[in-house]
Structures are given as C-alpha cells and as structure tokens.
C-alpha cells in the first residue's frame, strides 16, 4: 500500500509540474498602430484572432457556433500611436479562455482595433463606444476600424512564438445606396436623439413607393413599417428576373443548394405582386436606427440609448408621411417584423397604442422575461447553470429543429465579453441590457447578471419587468390598454425556435386568451417543428415564407382597415388599379 501512495505522490507532482509549465506564457505579441496626423490618441477594443485556415480572413471566422475560431480581446484606452501595444497575455479569449490553452500547431493570426468614440451624454456621463459607420454595428466590417494582414504563427507548448503585427489596413467607407424609380432613401436628423447623445444623430429609412406614385398626386397612402435588423437597402424587391449567370450557393441554414437564386426569384415575384392591379397601394419603409450598442435600437425609449421610440414614432414617421403623401393617422399605420423586428413590432404597438393599427410579430425576442429564452430572470439565481446540489449543467442557447444544441448562454456571453466589456460587444445579450437596463454610475448599462458568473441581479430584473416585459405590462395595464389594442395583436412562432423564443409566446398566449372586457381578439399561431423565424405561413416552408414578409400580412391588414377605419377616412384614393 505504501508503494502505491509513493507512486500516486510522484504522479501528482508530475501533473502539477505539467500544469505549471502549460500556464506560463513567454510570448511577446506586439501590435503597432500606425500614426495618423488627424488622430494621435486612440481608444477601442483590440482583438486578436487565431484561425486554422486562411480561406477567408480570420476576422470573418468568429461566431457562436461550432465552426468558430479563436479570439482574444483587451481594451485600448487613450493610447499614443507612437507606442507599440504589448498584447495582454492574460486577455480573455473565446472559446479558448486564455492564450496558454491554445492547442499546439500552426495558426493564421490577425489583429483588429474596433475604434471607440467619446460621447458626452445628456445624463452627464462620458462614455466611449463604437459609432456605427453605415455597416450596422459589425466589428469586423465597420469603416474606420484598422486591422493587420494575417500572418502564420506557430504555437508551442509554452504558447505562441513571438510576433509583431501592424494595423496598417483600414476598412473603407460604405457607399450609400442610390435612389431608384421605386426605392427612395432618406437621412433624417433627430433632435431628440441628438440632444441625448451630445452630437448629431441621424435616422435613415428606405421607402418603397407604390405603383404609379407620381401619376396619382391626389392619393395618400397607408404605411407598413417592416422592423428588423439594420437594412443596407430595401430588401426582397427586384425589377428583373434572376440573373441568368448566377452561380448557385448552398445555404447551411436551410440545407438547400441555390438559395441565392430562390431569393432573387422571390424578390422578382414580389415586384410583380406589387404591380398587380388588385394589390393595395401602400408605402413600405425599412428603418435604419443603429446605435453604438447594436445594429438597431429596438425602437423604444431607453435609459442607455435614448428616446428612439419617440424619435421614430413622433419625428421620423411623420416626416416620411409628409414627404411621400402618407395618410398620417394611426388607423393607417401597421407594424411587422421577425425576431428583433418581431419584438419591436409588438413593443411599439404596446408603447404607442393609438399611433398604430396592428402588429404582426413573428418569432419575437423574449416577450415575457420569465421565459428569457431558457432563463427566468425573476426566479432563477443563475443564467448559466441549472440549479442543482451536485450536477453542473449549462443552459442551452441554440438548437436545431431536432433539439441538437450548438451553444450555451454562458458561451454566448463569454464571446460578448471578449468582443467588448460594458455591454459594448454589439451582440445579442448586450443589446438587451443596453435597451432594458437602467444606467449604471459609469454611464454604461447595468448588468442583468454578472457576465463572468451568470449570477442574476434581482433589482435590475425588476426594472426590466416594470418597463420592458411586454406580457407583464399588458397584464398590469390591460384596463387601460385593452380597448386600444383590441384586434391589433398578432404573434407567430415556430415551436422549435432555435433560440427557445416560443416559450415566452406560450405564456403571452395564455394571458391574451384570458383577457376579457375586452377580449384581445387577435391571433397567436405556431409552426410545427418550425425553426427561427417562422412567421405564420402554414402553407410554405420557412425558407420561402421568410422572403414574403412584405406581402403576406396584406390581406389581414386590409381586413383590419375595413373594420377599424374611422368615419370619413380615406379608403379610396390609394385603391387605384393603374
């Protein structure tokens, strides 16, 4: 027995020696930021990316799925370009948490600085954030960000070999889309947002005009607002058939070859429907409202992002209706969208019940925070792990229609921590905080949970509940909102939504079906085994129906107008055929 103890002791000593050796990083990684006569000092998030291949640049190989490569991040604060940056050997990484955990082998390495700008907020806070530069808050594509060319590096048992990188490449500006006969583009300075952010802030919109808009100056039009992620231009509309020479591209998401051709076919089909003599004449708009936190604002007022709800509803939309002959009354405005856009459509309808006449919310982001994906922020103590005396099980964040899991809440949040602290990653959980949370003493959003441990803050959770939990708000205020929202709420979701968003829809449906005086008189529907983002089409597969948002709700909208338009409303000027 003694000899066994001796062998065990030797084994443990050897194991400890190996651990100590592997934890030591002797590498020197230096990053040079070339001088710029217009900006000597710089702030931002310095990202270092390792990838096994260079078929596409490493900066484009980071994601939350199984194909992701490795990324590390550190802050750069008031840095003088004359000085090299020694990359922090203790910088947090994803999915490998530290440099000493990198597997041995050869990698392609690239560095990128996500540049921050300084904002003097009307709240009295000074914050440093990445300004959107026309790309929709994408750190690896944002104009003005600087990066290095990829280099090949060897990682040994003691970590990466020493190497230098120069951020001598710059992402160029993005060309603005040009007006066409059908689609117009505007930029609108918001006085409300400019006052909050301490600088000029612009909202954008892409406007699809109805057939023969110029030939009918007497016509005024209802307005359809398509909410969703940042649109570079008006999508899903083309005036010509699919390109004959277009090479088929495979869609991993839908397991379909030639999906790019299908997209062009659907866009052309919509153009033909839009011109059909019997198709109602509407204005459709897609809004650009990126913030320093995300590719859009969630279209509501918030402590951290400012009054985007009021800016869109009371500034932008009346301006568009004036310029493009909208009817300009609440009964003539309709909201729709999926995912983020689904939440926005419902939230805006709830927050501004008299200004809109119906919402069609597909696969909305969590509309009940007791089902914040798979987390109950009111009852759960931790967002990353299920509660158990002995077992450790992470909470999933993404599945396919068969339930196969590809990511967890902890992993998603750790990637965000690498991309940016203080809710500055530009990713999903951080924008929810930027939208729903109160402002912290340092001017950044308060955390709903500790980003490292997952421990939930009940005070912040209660703030979310009172201000942005849509199911709770409807239940709390139904005596005030019920009559204003009757017949206006339509919600759709697949019962195998990839992000478990159907769970919140179930609880919302339970409340809505319990309403009386008045009964909500709307619609909640589910797609069997349908993934994100099913939108209510029971006849076609998801990969088709997601391309038909701009026409699929029109029959329901027309029915709504028929039963709700006030006496004397203009129901004829926009119903011309030619």
Give the residues covered by each predicted segment.
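Positively charged n-region of N-terminal signal peptides that target proteins for export
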Residues: 1-5
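Sec-dependent N-terminal signal peptides
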Residues: 6-10
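C-terminal motif of bacterial Sec signal peptides marking the signal peptidase cleavage site
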Residues: 14-17
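Bacterial Sec-dependent N-terminal signal peptides
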Residues: 19-23
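Contiguous beta-strand segments within globular domains
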Residues: 24-33, 39-47, 202-206, 225
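Short, solvent-exposed linear motifs at loop/edge-of-secondary-structure regions
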Residues: 38-54, 314-315
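Non-catalytic cap/lid and distal C-terminal segments of serine-dependent acyl enzymes
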Residues: 52-92, 97-578
